[in-house]
Amino acid sequence: MVIHDLPLKLKDFPMKEKPRERLLKVGAENLANHELLAILLRTGTKHESVLDLSNRLLRSFDGLRLLKEASVEELSSIPGIGMVKAIQILAAVELGSRIHKLANEEHFVIRSPEDGANLVMEDMRFLTQEHFVCLYLNTKNQVIHKRTVFIGSLNSSIVHPREVFKEAFKRSAASFICVHNHPSGDPTPSREDIEVTRRLFECGNLIGIELLDHLVIGDKKFVSLKEKGYL
């Protein structure tokens, strides 16, 4: 009879050594990096446990420092890390990156048009469609929420104040900044841009939530409609 060595799974570990159980008992923040990674990977190989595989993977990428920059090909080239595990790792890294980015955005203080443009420039300058985004601020001009209100050619009949201010009320915003991109790379405001801005400005004055600015994003450049005198 041939005996096959099967991969050692998390359920095969003694209870006190199981990363999942340890996470529940002591909290995720108290687990080592290789334990968290083992929870993602779930299984090792027939020659090593999932914890050993996790340790070896981290050593291959100098810990977490280079792991976040690894490609699917680089990850899957590591023995024991196939395509599925590589994709799981990349998905987890990307989620962590987005959460970190969101946390930074929500503490970002906007004191000038440059601050607002710097916050969104890299995300918006290469978009192939127009995205109309609102940055909602508290009384200290900190960004408390960012929402894409509309995607497509900007039109005053499409960008309805109701959608903009509904989110402002929901977030208890004191003020807001509108941002949208020009896929052409030229941030010169159009007539529609100006009409949308004035309409939202007037509505904001009526209900007490001020439109501070409307930024048009181009390729590494932007225009502030407030600085242009449209607010």
UniProtKB/Swiss-Prot annotation:
Q: Motif JAMM motif — list its residue ranges.
A: 180-193
Q: Which GO terms describe its molecular function?
A: metal ion binding; metallopeptidase activity
GO terms in the biological process aspect are:
proteolysis
Cite the entry's keywords alphabetically.
Answer: Hydrolase, Metal-binding, Metalloprotease, Protease, Zinc
Residues the record lists as binding Zn(2+): H180, H182, D193
What switches on expression, per the entry, is described as: Transcribed under partial control of SigM ECF sigma factor.
| Entry-linked PROSITE patterns | MPN, UPF0758
Q: Which residues form the MPN domain?
A: 109-231
> Which superkingdom heads the taxonomic lineage of this protein's source?
Bacteria
Matching entries from SUPFAM superfamilies are given as: JAB1/MPN domain, RuvA domain 2-like
Name the PANTHER family for this protein: DNA REPAIR PROTEIN RADC (PTHR30471), UPF0758 PROTEIN YEES-RELATED (PTHR30471:SF3)
Per the record, the similarity remark reads: Belongs to the UPF0758 family.
Please identify the protein, giving its name as recorded.
UPF0758 protein YsxA
Q: What is the phylogenetic placement of the source species in the record?
A: Bacteria, Bacillati, Bacillota, Bacilli, Bacillales
